[in-house]
């Protein structure tokens, strides 16, 4: 299936390209939206091509405001049977411990609220913290999370603009992968700007007659 034709998105001084190759599956994913988390990071969310027909069945015809305010819409993005990739690029320096402990705090809250937090999730959290233990993220460096529908979370690091071809670690826990993404774009996610960008971009794509024609999409942002 071809990727929908989308433009790059510009957030502050950072540019997210229209498509990237996942380090988990090596599939090409399209840029669904991008925004920032206050002054700390900028976030780009990429989706597998099949995401568009998958969400269109229920959400085609909705405008950006309706999607932005819809908890079920973002739950479908988080839990849908298609690959998702989130690229988190640093605006200020953070250590791996600083970053991972805050992410874990948010993810544990999400998983416990769902009533599905078990020993498997606790073990996955420990693995997640270990991956970040000795890392340092200067401004411009990125963390890539590839969430595969079969239940794995691939984590990769990059000091450059490109997404690495392979991940540093793979954690096989479906709930953790979903919680990481939900902590960014869910109802109480850290980046309302990314949530809004996804809603605007996907609404335009779903409501176009031919989302694969590059003339149909011309959306940029300076969130």
UniProtKB/Swiss-Prot annotation:
Annotated SUPFAM superfamilies: Chalcone isomerase
Function: Catalyzes the intramolecular cyclization of bicyclic chalcones into tricyclic (S)-flavanones. Responsible for the isomerization of 4,2',4',6'-tetrahydroxychalcone (also termed chalcone) into naringenin.
Misc. remarks from the entry: Part of the biosynthetic pathway for all classes of flavonoids, a large class of secondary plant metabolites, many of which are brightly colored.
Signal peptide: none
Enzyme Commission numbers on file: 5.5.1.6
Origin species: Arabidopsis thaliana
Organism ancestry: Eukaryota, Viridiplantae, Streptophyta, Embryophyta, Tracheophyta
Domain of life of the source: Eukaryota
Gene Ontology MF term list: chalcone isomerase activity
Keywords linked to the UniProt accession: Flavonoid biosynthesis, Isomerase
Family under the similarity heading: Belongs to the chalcone isomerase family.
The name this protein goes by in its record: Chalcone--flavanone isomerase 2
Gene3D superfamilies: 1.10.890.20, 3.50.70.10
Binding site for substrate: 41, 106, 183
Chain's gene name: CHI2
Pathway assigned to this chain's UniProt record: Secondary metabolite biosynthesis; flavonoid biosynthesis
Annotated site, Important for catalytic activity, chain positions: 99
Catalytic activity entry: a chalcone = a flavanone
Keyword Isomerase in annotation: yes
């Amino acid at each position: 299936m071809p990727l929908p034709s989308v433009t790059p998105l510009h957030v502050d001084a950072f540019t997210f390209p229209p498509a990237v190759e996942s380090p988990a599956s090596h599939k090409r994913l399209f840029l669904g939206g991008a925004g920032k988390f206050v002054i700390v990071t900028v976030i780009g969310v990429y989706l597998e091509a099949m995401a568009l027909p998958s969400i269109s069945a229920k959400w085609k015809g909705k405008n950006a405001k309706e999607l932005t305010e819809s908890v079920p819409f973002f739950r479908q993005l988080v839990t849908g049977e298609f690959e998702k990739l989130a690229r988190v690029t640093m605006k200020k320096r953070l250590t791996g411990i600083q970053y991972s402990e805050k992410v874990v705090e948010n993810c544990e809250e999400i998983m416990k609220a769902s009533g599905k937090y078990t020993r498997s999730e606790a073990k996955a959290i420990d693995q997640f913290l270990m991956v970040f233990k000795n890392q340092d993220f200067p401004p411009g460096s990125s963390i890539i999370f590839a969430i595969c529908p079969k239940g794995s979370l691939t984590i990769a690091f990059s000091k450059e603009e490109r997404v690495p071809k392979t991940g540093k670690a793979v954690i096989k826990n479906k709930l953790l992968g979903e919680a990481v993404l939900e902590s960014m774009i869910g109802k109480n996610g850290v980046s309302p700007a990314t949530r809004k960008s996804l809603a605007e971009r996907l609404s335009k794509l779903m409501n176009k007659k031919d989302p694969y024609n590059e003339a149909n999409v011309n959306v940029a942002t300076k969130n």
